[in-house]
A protein has these predicted regions:
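Gly/Pro-rich hinge or "lid" segments in bacterial periplasmic/extracellular proteins
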Residues: 36, 126-180, 184, 302
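Structural transition elements
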Residues: 156, 277-310, 327-332
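Surface-exposed binding/hinge segments that line
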Residues: 57, 93-136, 160
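N-terminal lobe/hinge region of extracytoplasmic solute-binding protein
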Residues: 1-49, 80, 151-152, 450
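Ligand-site clamp/hinge motif
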Residues: 144, 171-219, 347
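A bilobed periplasmic-binding-protein/Venus flytrap-type ligand-binding module shared by bacterial periplasmic
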Residues: 170-173, 232-257, 261
Length: 474
């Protein structure tokens, strides 16, 4: 659970924040546990001008928690704010960069004018940066007040918020989708996994949400007859990415040898308790663009040794793996990888960094070792979200590689609104990155929930956006 300091949708990128806020706010579109996009505050939409304009028909008779009416004004206010000065301060704005302006046609119709077509925009509008906020309330109370006293149109309304302690919500009886079954929700921010599990066992917590529970604590929960572990494939994928510019990993044969030299299935079973699935490219099975026919390269240490020999790599060559120091599970995984690499004659050293140092200073500046940990949880579950950031020349997460063919593929799919055509291009991008061996694709980690058996009608969601409208507690 998160130590969020602001409940303003444009201020954060934390998935845990969204598990609370998805109960307070609504977006124009909504994506539930089945990942299908359905109407939210918009009842219908149509693409005009070859995808450069989208017209939304808005739901009528909807009210914000403070009684203010939801209408076209609220939609325009929300996006003017997101794309203006206020949005500049937060991390959400770049997701919506395709939007040029929002035009009010009438009280229940708005047109989104786009700078260029964005095939993922309708999904992004279900995302938490695009939650619709109340104009009058924010103009009267100010942004700082809104941060701590959120108001939306969602099924629950905020009652009280204490930073670092928790937030209390109560059912919003006038929700357009009908009142939720629970009368109250209380979210507690518990930083320590052991404390969260102890509270679950004591019956003071009914549900612990990802990514709180480490694999090592699963047996404790499973051993308690009052509790259960519920898991589902999540959006987070892990890989060891390569320095393709210099050193031994600049050679594609060496990169392929490193992939063949690691037994990913064994790592999943022994270290991750089976709570992950192997991946063939840097995306999970739920990702739009994943090719289910593409299989991960098998563990083959003999073939790996032959490739290293062919590339002229001496036995005992040292390679550095950069990891996030606070990720204890991945530290174990990287130790196992180092042991596997020893088997094929390489000496892997592990260099831990503080997470923000690795992400903001080391990777973007191209100062990593031969390999570096990359965990990515694109909540859109659209491969573009991952692939463009990881492989396009000049992107923050791609300090080493520049491939004009890959750039052209990545750019071409961004302007295509035909889903089937786009999916084919995304699949071909995945195949191309695997042919070039741009990383060791490791695994897609599950979203793990600890649940009291008193909780009924609970459906785990892959993207942490846990809407608790149908849940009951005995």
């Amino acid at each position: 659970r998160e130590r969020g300091n602001s409940w303003d949708p444009i201020d954060t990128f934390l998935v845990n924040w969204a598990s609370v806020a998805t109960n307070i706010y609504d977006g124009l579109t909504y994506r539930g546990a089945d990942l299908k996009l359905v109407p939210g505050l918009a009842t219908a939409w149509e693409e005009l001008d070859e995808g450069k304009r989208i017209r939304f028909t808005l739901r009528e008779g909807v009210k914000f928690h403070d009684g203010e009416p939801f209408n076209a004004e609220a939609v325009k206010f929300t996006f003017d704010r997101l794309l203006g000065e206020e949005g500049k301060k937060g991390p959400q704005r770049s997701n919506y960069a395709a939007i040029d302006k929002v035009e009010i046609i009438d009280a229940k119709t708005v047109d989104f004018h786009l700078k260029a077509p964005d095939p993922v925009l309708l999904t992004k509008l279900a995302g938490y940066g695009a939650m619709i906020v109340p104009p009058k309330y924010i103009q009267e109370k100010g942004d700082d007040y809104f941060n701590a006293h959120p108001v939306g149109t969602g099924p629950f309304k905020a009652v009280s918020y204490e930073p670092k302690i928790g937030i209390k919500l109560e059912a919003f009886a006038d929700h357009w989708g009908g009142a939720p079954k629970l009368s109250n929700l209380e979210y507690r921010f518990i930083a320590e996994p052991a404390t969260a599990v102890a509270e679950l066992q004591a019956g003071r917590v009914d549900l612990v949400i990802p990514p709180t529970i480490p694999v090592g604590m699963i047996p404790t929960i499973q051993a308690d007859p009052k509790l259960e572990v519920v898991s589902t494939a999540g959006p987070t994928v892990y890989a060891l990415r390569f320095n393709t510019k210099s050193g031994p990993t600049a050679d594609e044969r060496v990169r392929k040898a490193l992939i063949l030299g690691v037994d990913r299935d064994a790592i999943i079973q022994t270290i991750l308790g089976g709570q992950a699935a192997p991946i063939a490219s840097f995306q999970g099975a739920l990702s739009f663009g994943n090719d289910p026919d593409m299989k991960p390269l098998p563990y083959d240490p003999e073939k790996a040794k032959a490739l290293l020999k062919e590339a002229g790599i001496a036995t005992g060559t040292t390679l550095q793996i950069d990891v996030r120091g606070n990720d204890s599970t991945f530290n174990e995984v990287s130790q196992a990888i180092a042991s596997y690499l020893q088997v094929i004659g390489l000496n892997a050293t592990i260099k831990p960094y503080e997470t923000n140092v690795l992400l903001n200073d080391i990777i973007p500046a191209g100062k990593t070792g031969a390999m570096f940990e990359q965990a990515w949880g694109g909540w859109t579950l659209d491969y573009d979200n991952t692939a463009y950031s990881m492989y396009h020349s000049g992107e923050k997460w791609n300090p080493y590689d520049s491939d004009p063919k890959l750039d052209a593929l990545l750019e071409s799919q961004r302007s295509i609104t035909d889903r089937a055509k786009r999916e084919e291009i995304l699949k071909s991008i995945a195949h191309y990155t695997v042919d070039r061996a741009l990383e060791i694709p490791l695994y897609n980690y599950n979203a793990i929930f600890g649940v009291s058996k008193r909780v009924k009608n609970f459906t785990p969601v892959p993207d942490s956006r846990l809407r608790l409208t149908d849940v009951t507690v005995e």
